């Protein structure tokens, strides 16, 4: 039987693009681990992706995961859009390169053999874990220490 894990994530950007951060909570049998990191120049979508990636990469064995995010971009991207992106060589329906492809590939790899249920929660609506992740992400964004090497400014 797989371990049942809950993950809650959020990303934040002070300006978009601008300094950003992510926050994540990983919960297993009443134990919690939090993750957060701030980046000097990034976007909100990149931080939403990073929150999910970091939490999933922290799992040491195959798990049954319920991952809650307030990002439709992440939830729809990983459950719907990614299949066609991969078929098209990481291009959109308009034959343009997929934005944030470095992180989409990393998230795809982080899924591994996990069984994941993706849950969308409304942001800033009083969901306790989402609010905590938002606080972690905002605090990290206010004190960025990392450079987002994959961020590419729009041409």
UniProtKB/Swiss-Prot annotation:
Extract the coiled-coil ranges from the record.
Answer: none
In its keyword annotation, does this UniProt entry include Cytoplasm?
yes
- Could you tell me which residue ranges the RNase H type-1 domain spans? 1-142
**According to the record, how does the cofactor bind?**
Binds 1 Mg(2+) ion per subunit. May bind a second metal ion at a regulatory site, or after substrate binding.
Q: GO CC terms on record?
A: cytoplasm
> Which Cys pairs does UniProt list as disulfide-bonded?
none
Enzyme class, top EC level, equals hydrolase
Any GO BP annotation: DNA replication, removal of RNA primer
- Cofactors (names): Mg(2+)
Q: Which GO terms describe its molecular function?
A: magnesium ion binding; nucleic acid binding; RNA-DNA hybrid ribonuclease activity
In terms of superkingdom, the source organism counts as Bacteria
Give the E.C. number(s).
3.1.26.4
CDD domains reported in the protein's UniProt record: RNase_HI_prokaryote_like
- Which UniProt keywords are listed? Cytoplasm, Endonuclease, Hydrolase, Magnesium, Metal-binding, Nuclease
Which residues of this UniProt protein bind Mg(2+) 2? Answer: 10, 134
Which reactions fall under this protein's catalytic activity? Endonucleolytic cleavage to 5'-phosphomonoester
**Residues that, per the record, bind Mg(2+) 1:** 10, 48, 70
- State the HAMAP family in the record: RNase_H (MF_00042)
Describe its partners and assembly state.
Monomer.
What NCBIfam families does its record include? PRK00203.1
Could you tell me what this protein does?
Endonuclease that specifically degrades the RNA of RNA-DNA hybrids.
Q: Which family does it belong to?
A: Belongs to the RNase H family.
Tell me the protein's name.
Ribonuclease H
Give the encoding gene's name. Answer: rnhA
